From Swiss-Prot:
Species this chain originates from: Sinorhizobium meliloti (strain Sm2011 / Rm2011 / 2011)
Record flagged with keyword NADP: no
Protein name per its UniProtKB record: Ribonuclease J
Assembly and binders: Homodimer, may be a subunit of the RNA degradosome.
Keywords: Cytoplasm, Endonuclease, Exonuclease, Hydrolase, Metal-binding, Nuclease, RNA-binding, rRNA processing, Zinc
Alphabetized CDD domains for the sequence: RNaseJ_MBL-fold (cd07714)
One GO MF term attached to the UniProt entry: RNA binding
Binding site for Zn(2+) 1: H85, H87, H153, D175
Length: 564
């Protein structure tokens, strides 16, 4: 009887928790952990493993990844990683972080293909074994039973997850929308969500991206019709730039081009990789082969459509090269049309406007989503969110995938819609979903790490603070050689990098700094110059002070003093 009571007490201690390490309080870098068991003995599954992209405040950084230090002690208790879809903010960190985790990965055929294509392109040494997991499948992982439910989004084969445990069922939506006329893939599975709702849902962990927008998102089919009309009516070449992962839109454009008697050229390596994967899994059946780039010049202007990367102003993408007239085999002319079939991601406005201006200077006609319905979001607006609430009838709503404004608006909508519990949650906070009321019970290490080239590290390890200083005020290198009497042996060597060439009186900056170095050393008696560290610091301070006087900024200064 004692053993039975002990087992009962242990069972009573078991908890179901949700711990986001990214994507809650920000857009991007989505990574969520579900844990089950007693504190200190929980087993975990990871849902998604995404990146976000650096802004100008992170000079030189290529990608921003979630810090998974929390999992260092939980590595043996992490049972699986499940990827909901192949957008960078949901799967982009997996190739870099998986070697430190080495656990089974579950993903759809398209997502698995994208992971392999990404690994090959990045020349990653880690070959991730992936188990195919698609709409309608169920897997048992430790204390979790996970079902994939089909949803609609702006990429092939997205899925929501139904995570069942002894303490209740969680619906994790991933990215989704309700589109009754999608251009590719099935509808969001209303029937299955309703069935799951009838079974009883403890918590809905739900996309908040468009929680500030009223109504229902327009259909992708409407975008297809709008693009088809633009292509049919255009007199010259047509270029359409969109997100490279939007296979449905690429396919729609290709079909519209064929209907208008036009050939299609794909430009951009990322888009070509996506289309190759889509072909491999059967998503491009019936679409004619695309032109080779060197065939472009032989096609009449009114017989070609170019689908190209660069909708976010990426300087090395195909569209930016077109705007700068730098492409070898492809160019647009006055009277041609380029359509921005995309939204502007915050932070990219200037880069996109620069490209638009470059195109307009060439006489190219620009069409954006402010002039025509050429883009729709892949995320649910408020009416769609309320529809999901009605389908699954959750006891708890956990808004995720959004910044503070999105999460707050989503929470208010949930409460207005009658959901009993809507806890506030941010990255690193451990939310107990059951037993008892939903509440934050702990905080885990969380944050960001940075990928630069082939290296990954934290803010200090990657020298980002120093880079910021360098980008703001440049660098001065000073080399001083002293003889046995601690006098100058030759002239000091002063090399300013990234500083103005002249001060406001026309004096060369290098000469001004040279004088500062001489003055700093000569102001110190010979006997005290033996303290090379003190002398080094005196020179550094003198150079920074002088540049501050003549320029108003203090550069990074590196001083080398050698005594021979």
């Amino acid at each position: 009887m004692k053993k039975a009571k002990a087992h009962h007490d242990m069972a009573q201690d078991e908890e179901l928790v949700f711990l986001p390490l990214g994507g809650v309080g920000e857009i991007g870098m989505n990574l969520g952990l579900y844990g089950y068991g007693r504190p200190g003995h929980r087993q975990w599954i990871m849902v998604d493993c995404g990146v976000t992209f650096p802004g100008p405040e992170l000079p030189g950084v290529d990608l921003v990844l979630p810090d998974i230090a929390f999992l260092a002690e939980q590595r043996r208790n992490l049972k699986a990683i499940i990827i909901t879809h192949a957008h960078e903010d949901h799967y982009g960190a997996l190739n870099d972080l998986w070697p430190g985790l080495n656990v089974p990965v579950y993903a759809s055929p398209f997502t698995a293909g994208m992971l392999e294509a990404k690994r090959a392109f990045e020349k990653s040494r880690s070959e991730i074994p992936i188990t195919i997991f698609k709409q309608g499948d169920r897997i048992n992982v430790g204390p979790f039973s996970v079902e994939a439910v089909g949803v609609n989004h702006s990429i092939p084969e997205p899925m929501a997850l139904v995570i069942r445990t002894q303490l209740g069922t969680v619906v994790h939506t991933g990215d989704w929308k309700i589109d009754l006329e999608p251009s590719l893939g099935p509808l969001t599975d209303e029937s299955r969500f309703r069935q799951i709702g009838e079974e009883g849902v403890l918590a809905l962990v739900c996309d908040s991206t468009n929680a500030l927008r009223e109504g229902v998102s327009p259909s992708e089919r409407q975008v297809s019709e709008s693009l088809a009309k633009i292509i049919a009516d255009a007199e010259g070449r047509v270029g359409i730039t969109t997100f490279s992962s939007n296979v449905g839109r690429i396919r729609s454009v290709a079909e519209a081009a064929e209907a208008a008697g036009r050939e299609v050229l794909l430009l951009g390596s990322s888009m070509k990789r996506v289309v190759d994967v889509a072909r491999d899994v059967g998503l491009m059946e019936g679409v004619k082969p695309f032109l080779a780039e060197d065939e472009f010049g032989y096609i009449p202007r009114d017989k070609v459509v170019v689908i190209l990367t660069g909708s976010q102003g990426e300087p090395r993408a195909a569209l930016a090269k077109i705007a700068r007239d730098e492409m070898r085999n492809v160019a647009f002319s006055a009277g041609d049309t380029i359509v921005f079939s995309s939204r502007t991601i915050p932070g990219n406005e200037k880069a996109i406007n620069d490209i638009k201006n470059g195109l307009i200077e060439q006489g190219i006609h620009i069409i954006t989503d402010s002039e025509a319905l050429v883009h729709v979001s892949g995320h649910p607006r408020r009416t769609e969110l309320q529809q999901m609430y009605q389908w699954v009838k959750p006891q708890i709503l956990v808004p995720v995938h959004g910044e503070a404004a999105h999460l707050t608006a989503h929470a208010e909508l949930g409460l207005q819609s009658g959901i009993p519990s809507v806890p506030r949650l941010r990255n690193g906070e451990m939310l107990r979903l059951a037993p008892g009321p939903a509440e934050v019970i702990d905080e885990a290490p969380h944050g960001r790490i940075y990928k630069d080239g082939t290296l990954i590290g934290d803010f200090e390890e990657m020298g980002i603070g120093e880079r910021r200083k360098l980008s703001f005020a440049g660098h001065v290198s000073v080399s001083v050689v002293l003889d046995s009497r601690y006098d100058f042996l030759g002239d000091p060597d002063v090399v300013p990098i990234g500083l103005p060439e002249f001060d406001d009186e026309g004096e060369a900056m290098e000469d001004t700094l040279y004088d500062a170095v001489l003055g700093a050393v000569e102001s110190i008696p010979r006997a005290k110059r033996k303290d090379l560290a003190m002398l080094q610091e005196a020179v550094r301070r003198a150079v920074r002070s002088t540049t501050n006087q003549v320029w108003g900024k203090k550069p990074v200064v590196t001083v080398f003093i050698t005594k021979v």
